[in-house]
Regions:
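Serine/proline-rich low-complexity intrinsically disordered segments, especially terminal tails, linkers
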Residues: 4, 24, 118-120
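Bacterial N-terminal signal peptides
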Residues: 22-32
Length: 343
């Protein structure tokens, strides 16, 4: 599983200044000239805008498949090779209308471009017969080209969401998340090169699935499409749904370097994650099945689907120390374990 969000780099960056202290100074004097920590914070200026482009890529390969009946694994299963790939691209432009402490008070987000593509390649051999199948699908979102305003409600401790101009499509707003700035990866206090801090694992949902549920739907209904990646963003829930708030494990960040590049001051943050999640996806699948067109004479009775996965990854966040926003981010992950059980 690979996820590589790539926000646009900002060329308007601050020149760096470094302070050097002689090691020969006596202790009391040295204490007065300790190098200050870096303020790696999210604080864009009010009225400014930022364009961000994310690209998430995922590849799954089948390791083992079994069918059980009355608790017993059925013999004579065919040999099967299967690979599923999924690519999602998200482009937005955020206008920071009003800023609060560490987050916007009011944010206007325009969805510039939303696209999703999936493909599946399967080869099955049984009783000397070979059957090869290749499928591909695309998904789109009604949010594409629209503008959503996020307004912080201090009493409710949440963002209120509304279309601009107003539209009666509340279902599209329900799963949207305001944070597409990767704020979960930033330190709470000043840090020096080499300092580490712990990342709230549950907050990684906004990093792995930026923007929340973007309401992708298949462009065309495909008969028998149940197997197309188990609906990863193609009509059976988004990656945000699969992760939700059930993430467990650990995640750490480290200030690896503060450097100058083309006259810019950049903070380089190294990120490592080891996470796991268990999710009952039954309700999402049942809702998706209502819209599935089955071949004539075919009926499917669905009981449940559970997803269990473990993931490890490393990444690098480069932070613009002048505009106090993302310069770039790349995260590579791999599934140590992914099990899907359904009946």
């Amino acid at each position: 599983l690979c996820a590589a969000p790539r926000p646009v780099r900002d060329p308007n960056l601050m020149n760096a200044k470094h302070l050097f202290v002689s090691a020969a100074l006596i202790a009391p004097v040295l204490a007065a000239f300790v190098l200050p920590g870096e303020k790696v914070r999210f604080a864009p200026a009010e009225g400014t805008s930022a364009t961000k482009n994310f690209e998430n890529k995922m590849e799954l390969t089948l390791d083992h498949m079994a069918i059980t009946m009355n608790g017993q694994e059925m013999p004579g299963m065919p040999e099967m090779d299967m690979t599923i790939t999924h690519t999602q691209k998200v482009g937005v432009t955020d206008e920071f209308v009003a800023m609060g402490d560490g987050q916007p008070k009011k944010l206007k987000r325009h969805f510039d471009a939303l696209s999703s593509e999936s493909s599946m390649s399967m080869k099955m051999e049984m009783m000397g017969q070979s059957n090869d199948q290749d499928h591909s699908s695309e998904a789109e979102s009604e949010l594409d080209g629209k503008t959503v305003v996020f307004t912080w409600d201090g009493e409710a401790k949440e963002f209120k969401k509304a279309f601009d101009p107003a539209e009666d499509k509340a279902d599209l707003l329900k799963g949207l998340m305001e944070d597409m700035d990767l704020r979960a990866l930033l330190p709470e206090n000043e840090v020096k090169v080499g300092d580490e801090w712990t990342i709230d694992v549950k907050s990684l949902v906004d990093v792995l699935a930026p923007g929340g549920d973007l309401s992708f739907k298949p462009k065309e209904k495909e008969g028998g499409g149940m197997g197309m990646g188990m609906g990863m963003g193609q009509g059976m829930g988004s990656m945000h749904d699969y992760l939700s708030d059930l993430l467990e494990g650990e995640a750490k960040a480290k200030l690896g370097d503060v450097r100058e590049e083309d006259g810019a001051k950049l903070a380089v943050i190294k990120v490592t994650i080891k996470i796991a999640s268990q999710k009952d996806m039954s309700d999402l699948v049942k809702d998706a099945m209502k819209d599935q067109e089955m071949p004539q004479g075919m009926e499917i009775e669905f009981d449940h689907m559970d997803v269990d996965f473990k993931m490890e990854g490393e990444g690098e966040l480069v932070w613009n120390m002048k505009t106090n926003q993302i310069a770039s981010f790349e995260l590579s992950t791999r599934c140590v374990w992914l099990e899907i059980q359904y009946a």
